[in-house]
C-alpha cells in the first residue's frame, strides 16, 4: 500500500525534469530513476495548492492502491509537499494508443484492434470487479508497453471514483467526445458509463474516426444525446459482422442495455478463435476498413 511521504523525492529518486513523457490537466509526467536500484519509473507531478486538490490526489492514490492488473498502470511510491504531490509509477515507453490511431503509416488490422480492445476490457473488468469507475477512458489514457508489442496499460485515475450502489453518483467532467449520454444529461453513472467509452475507443481504433465529434462541443454533445453514429463510412468496409455487433452493443444510449466488460470479453468478436483465424488468413491482413482491390 502506497501512502504519500512528506519527504523530498530527491532523496530516493532522480527525476529528469527536462524530459516530459506526457501531461494533462494535472501537470506533467517525467522519467525518473530509483537511486537504490536504478529502476526506470515515471513521476507524475500534480499541482496541489488547495486542500481540495490534495484530497483529489489522495483519492487517486487510494484507488490505485486497490488495483493490481497487468493492463492497469501500477503505483510505486508517492510524495507530498506544500505545492505539489508526486506519484511514482511504472514506466512504459510505447507511447499513447492515440498516436497509433492518428499515425498514417501505422495501419491497424481488425485483429490488431481485437487485441487492443480485449486488453482494455480486461483492465476495465478488473476495475469494475473492485467497484471502481475510471470515468475518463480515451485513447490518450491508454499507453502501449513498447513500440512493437500490442500490449497496453490504462493510465490516469485522477477522475476515477469508487462506485457505491446506494449512493447515486453524478459527474460533470470528462472529454466531450468520449462522454456517455448519462454524463451529458447529468444522470447517474455506473459501470456501463465506462463501457460506452470503450465503444468510442473501439470505433476509433477500427476507423481513425471519432463517432460523435462535431464542429464544436455543443454539436458533439448533441450527437451523443441523439446517439447519432453509424458504420457506413468507407473505413468500415470489410469489418466483420461480429465487429459491427460488438460496437453496436456498446454505443447504446440506454445504459442498462450496454454489455458489461465481462460480457464483452465473452463476445465472439473478442473470444471466437475461429473468427480470429479467419481474420488472420483473410485478405493478407488488410487494414480494418481498407478496400480490397479485388472486391467488386
Task: Show where each model-derived region lies.
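Glycine-rich ATP phosphate-binding loop
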Residues: 28-49
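Activation segment signature within eukaryotic-like protein kinase domains
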Residues: 116-117
Amino acid at each position: 500500500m502506497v501512502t504519500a511521504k512528506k519527504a523530498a523525492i530527491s532523496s530516493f529518486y532522480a527525476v529528469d525534469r527536462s524530459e516530459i513523457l506526457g501531461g494533462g490537466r494535472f501537470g506533467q509526467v517525467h522519467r525518473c530513476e530509483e537511486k537504490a536500484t536504478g529502476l526506470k519509473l515515471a513521476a507524475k507531478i500534480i499541482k496541489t495548492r488547495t486542500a481540495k486538490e490534495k484530497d483529489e490526489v489522495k483519492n487517486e492514490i487510494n484507488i490505485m492502491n486497490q488495483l493490481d492488473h497487468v493492463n492497469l498502470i501500477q503505483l510505486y511510491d508517492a510524495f507530498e509537499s506544500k505545492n505539489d504531490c508526486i506519484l511514482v509509477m511504472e514506466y512504459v515507453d510505447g507511447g499513447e494508443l492515440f498516436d497509433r490511431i492518428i499515425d498514417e503509416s501505422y495501419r491497424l488490422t481488425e485483429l490488431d484492434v481485437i487485441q487492443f480492445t480485449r486488453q482494455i476490457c480486461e483492465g476495465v473488468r478488473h476495475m469494475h470487479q473492485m467497484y471502481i469507475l475510471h470515468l475518463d477512458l480515451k485513447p490518450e489514457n491508454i499507453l502501449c508497453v513498447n513500440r512493437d508489442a500490442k500490449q497496453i496499460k490504462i493510465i490516469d485515475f485522477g477522475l476515477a471514483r469508487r462506485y457505491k450502489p446506494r449512493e447515486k453518483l453524478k459527474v460533470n467532467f470528462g472529454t466531450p467526445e468520449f462522454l456517455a449520454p448519462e454524463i451529458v444529461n447529468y444522470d447517474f453513472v455506473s459501470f456501463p458509463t465506462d463501457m460506452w467509452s470503450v465503444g468510442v475507443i473501439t470505433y476509433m481504433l477500427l476507423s481513425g474516426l471519432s463517432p460523435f465529434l462535431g464542429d464544436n462541443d455543443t454539436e458533439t454533445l448533441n450527437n451523443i444525446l441523439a446517439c447519432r453514429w453509424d458504420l457506413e463510412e468507407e473505413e468500415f468496409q470489410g469489418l466483420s459482422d461480429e465487429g459491427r455487433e460488438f460496437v453496436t452493443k456498446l454505443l447504446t444510449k440506454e445504459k442498462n442495455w450496454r454489455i458489461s466488460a465481462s460480457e464483452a470479453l465473452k463476445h465472439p468478436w473478442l473470444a471466437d478463435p475461429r473468427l480470429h483465424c479467419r481474420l488472420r488468413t483473410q485478405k493478407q491482413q488488410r487494414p480494418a476498413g481498407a478496400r480490397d482491390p479485388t472486391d467488386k
